[in-house]
Each structure stands twice: as structure tokens, then as C-alpha cells.
């Protein structure tokens, strides 16, 4: 099975951008999530649209459930359904024992664990 409607979290840079490039092509629709990399997301969008890919960009802080819900709603409005979810986004800060806080730990857990689970649950509803 080949995916045609794809969501990639953390898709604007590094591995996410490489995945978007690999999965792009005519008759493909890709929703690229970004948080702080707006200019890179816009540049990638232009690049992918040259080869016939329809690209949607969505900004969201994946540590915030309200942003995750808005992203899912946006994805459904644009893609109608999706047949591939790439949970690529992650939060990686250089926390050490001397600057570690429960707030930063919570943000890591929400971004790196809870959100992929919530998005996977939404994906399961679409297949």
C-alpha cells in the first residue's frame, strides 16, 4: 500500500524534512507540522509543490493538548482522512540534574509520549 495523505510531525527540518521529500510526489498530500521552524517549513512547502505535492503547513506546540486538537481538526479539514502518520517531532533540551524541573519533564512527556499516542489514536479512527 502506498500512502497518499500523510501527516508528518516535526516535518520542517532534519529527518522530518527528509521523510517529506521521500514521500512527496504527484497525487500526494502532505501536512507538515512545525513549531518554531516557520521559514524552513515554508521553504520546504515550495520545494515539494514543484513536484506536484499538495502541502499544508500547521503550527502547533505539541506539549499543549489544545494545539494538538487544533492540528487534528485542521488535518481532517484539509486531508479529509489520512493514511500515513509519521510521529517524528520530539523535544530535546539539554536538561541536567542541576537545572531539571518538573515542568520541563512534563513538557518532554507531553511532547514525546502523550502526543504521539493521541495522534496514533486519531490515525486509527481513519483506517
PLM segments and residue spans:
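Conserved NAD(P)H cofactor-binding loop of Rossmann-fold oxidoreductase domains
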Residues: 88-93
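Conserved hydrophobic beta-strands of the Rossmann-like cofactor-binding core
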Residues: 5-8, 82-86
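Conserved glycine-rich cofactor-binding loop
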Residues: 12-14
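Conserved glycine-rich Rossmann-like NAD(P)H-binding loop of the short-chain dehydrogenase/reductase
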Residues: 28-42
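A short, exposed helix-loop element centered on a Lys and neighboring polar residues
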Residues: 120-121
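Substrate-binding pocket helix/loop in short-chain dehydrogenase/reductase
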Residues: 96-97, 104-109
Amino acid at each position: 500500500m502506498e500512502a497518499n495523505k500523510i501527516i508528518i510531525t516535526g516535518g520542517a527540518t532534519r529527518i522530518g524534512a527528509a521523510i517529506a521529500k521521500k514521500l512527496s510526489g504527484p497525487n500526494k498530500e502532505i501536512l507538515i507540522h512545525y513549531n518554531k521552524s516557520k521559514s524552513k517549513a515554508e521553504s520546504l512547502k515550495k520545494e515539494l509543490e514543484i513536484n506536484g505535492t499538495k502541502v499544508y503547513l500547521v503550527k502547533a506546540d505539541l506539549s499543549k493538548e489544545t494545539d494538538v486538537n487544533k492540528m487534528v481538526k485542521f488535518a481532517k479539514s484539509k486531508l479529509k482522512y489520512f493514511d500515513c502518520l509519521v510521529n517524528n517531532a520530539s523535544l530535546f533540551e539539554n536538561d541536567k540534574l542541576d537545572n531539571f524541573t518538573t515542568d520541563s519533564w512534563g513538557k518532554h512527556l507531553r511532547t514525546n509520549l502523550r502526543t504521539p499516542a493521541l495522534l496514533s489514536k486519531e490515525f486509527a479512527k481513519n483506517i
